[in-house]
Amino acid sequence: MVAHRARRRKRASATQLYRTCKAAGTCPPDVIPKVEGTTLADRILQWGGLGIYLGGLGIGTGSGTGGRTGYVPLSTRPGTVVDVSVPARPPVVIEPVGPSDPSIVNLLEDSSIINSGSTVPTFSGTGGFEVTSSATTTPAVLDITPATDNVVISSSNFTNPAFTEPSLLEVPQNGEVSGHILVSTPTAGTHSYEEIPMETFASPGTGNEPISSTPVPGVSRIAGPRLYAKAVTQVKVTDPAFLSRPTSLVTFDNPAFEPGDETIIFERPYPPSQVPDPDFMDIIRLHRPALTSRRGTVRFSRLGTKLSMHTRSGKGIGARVHYYQDLSPIGPTEDIEMEPLLAPAENAAGDSIYDVFADVEDADIAFTGRSRSATSSRGYTTVSPLSSTLTTKYGNVTIPFVSPVDVHLHPGPDIITPASTQWPFVPLVPADTTHYVYIDGGDFYLWPVTLFVPRRRRRKRLSYFLADGTVAL
């Protein structure tokens, strides 16, 4: 088996070796003369150049370029350069200018006359005039007397089809031929129209249509403050200053501005000696108030943040406290018992009830029963409703009346007696003594007498009277 020889590594060039070994003094003996040009061949050329000029031959240690003219191939002649001369311009003839000749030189030759087209037609008419010129110096005298004959002047228009002024274009006119028929000149082209379908903007719907462009499915609820979480301490505050001046519970300072519905931020936790309420110790923030209802009460709440410790990074850590104060309980709804307006038939005479919706036939009975006093077995006595004194078991109570009010009286029909009366007059038997009272009103109030009557039964019928109305007898 033949062993392969290792490849020979190429040595660096003399220039690269000279750069690194010159300063250290470790260069090989053939590197420095080759780079500095002190070899034997260089010295022979230097010595021979003292007496012989060899600069034009290009002999030296440099790159071979063949000198100034380059290398010339053997058995050939160098190429010759043909010089092509540019013909000379003819000399400009200089014309002599005399003292009396003009100094202006015409740059252009005589130009030819450009044809301007057809001539403008001359004016022709029946009553024209001619202009004559003369060399006389006699002043002209104009006759300003008006002419006796009427002068008619006619004119002719010539249209150039090559050019028409836009301002002189004639617009086609409409001509009325007969009654309601209008004939117009036809125009170029036809005008077409497009049928656009009409859509209804408002139409009756089912009520389930969306009212916004992107309706949100379902109902989104706003999350309230988490006041009753396990990590929140519950503290009840009884001081009423917690509602209006919560900062007075944290510090003794008297601030000029007391924010009510905003978050209160304290710069630093105050020492225990400067905190009026110990429950508000180490408080650095009190959030805005919130009103809630819990277990039948209206509760005023504020969420506070305490600063208990600091970490090495400077961040403060503290607990959250829920301060609350119950304002008032929410009582159950009371049931209001409705009282009937119509009185039963077995009503006692002592119960003074004024029923304005009673029948007309019962008016006389009700009037008779109300005009006398009645004593019941309940231990109190009532008098006529027109009286202002009420006698009870507690003594006499005087009820003052209000100022008199004008009552409008509407008279009834006139009573006309018969013209022929027979004497002696015999009245009809039985005589009709019924009197009717018509009351028209809308507002009713409790009779003041019934306010001082003790109620012992659950269902008590109260009296009513008119606040404003009219009475007709």
From Swiss-Prot:
Source organism, top-level taxon: Viruses
Cysteines joined through disulfide linkages: C21-C27
Location in the cell: Virion; Host nucleus; Host early endosome; Host Golgi apparatus
Keywords: Capsid protein, Cytoplasmic inwards viral transport, Disulfide bond, DNA-binding, Host endosome, Host Golgi apparatus, Host nucleus, Host-virus interaction, Late protein, Microtubular inwards viral transport, Phosphoprotein, Viral penetration into host nucleus, Virion, Virus entry into host cell
GO cellular component: host cell; host cell endosome; host cell Golgi apparatus; host cell nucleus; viral capsid
InterPro entries noted in UniProt: Late_L2
Post-translational modification: Highly phosphorylated.
GO molecular function: DNA binding; structural molecule activity
A GO BP entry: symbiont entry into host cell
Record-stated family: Belongs to the papillomaviridae L2 protein family.
Assembly and binders: Interacts with major capsid protein L1. Interacts with E2; this interaction inhibits E2 transcriptional activity but not the DNA replication function E2. Interacts with host GADD45GIP1. Interacts with host HSPA8; this interaction is required for L2 nuclear translocation. Interacts with host importins KPNB2 and KPNB3. Forms a complex with importin alpha2-beta1 heterodimers via interaction with the importin alpha2 adapter. Interacts with host DYNLT1; this interaction is essential for virus intracellular transport during entry.
Protein name per UniProt: Minor capsid protein L2
